[in-house]
Design a protein with these regions (language model features):
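Intrinsically disordered, low-complexity terminal regulatory regions
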Residues: 2-97
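Regulatory sensory and allosteric helical modules in signal-transduction proteins
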Residues: 68-69, 75-85, 90-145
Length: 148
């Protein structure tokens, strides 16, 4: 998606999230260190969608969890980038490729960066249930597991 269109799309998503009552997570204490490590790895500038090891991880995650959709996402200071995904069609892949961090489900991994996060039911969990009120619904699945 062209940068201008992506920025407009993200602006609409932010507005929808605000109207729906989605509350962003505060940045963790080690945010600068976390972002410096992402920068050091150069991962935000790389397209990993064609790399076999990441595609295999998303496929295995789908198989093990029974989830139709799986993703590997990286949280930057303002955005979430999907680096590899499984089970999405071409349009869905375009939409999930980049989104505002403050409306992503993955942002909740930052609340407790020393622990994996498991949300059994995204539609009922207090942190994520308002996302379903966004036009088009922002929940790609019922379940989420994230690692900081």
């Amino acid at each position: 998606m062209k940068k201008f269109i992506r920025e407009k799309f993200n602006s609409i998503l932010r507005s929808e999230a605000h109207k729906a009552g989605v509350i962003p997570v505060q940045s963790p204490d080690d945010e600068n260190q976390r972002l410096a490590e992402i920068e050091r790895l150069g991962i935000m500038d790389r397209d990993l969608s064609g790399e076999r090891k990441y595609n295999t991880m998303t496929q295995v995650a789908s198989y093990l969890t029974g989830c139709k959709h799986t993703m590997i996402n990286i949280l930057e200071s303002k955005i979430q980038q999907c680096k590899s995904s499984f089970g999405f069609n071409m349009i869905e892949n375009t939409v999930i490729k980049e989104m505002p961090r403050e409306i992503s489900v993955c942002q909740y991994t930052l609340e407790n960066p020393s622990q994996p996060l498991v949300i059994e039911d995204l539609w009922e969990d207090e942190r994520t249930k308002n996302m379903s009120k966004m036009r088009g619904g922002a929940l790609p699945s019922d379940f989420m597991q994230g690692l900081p």
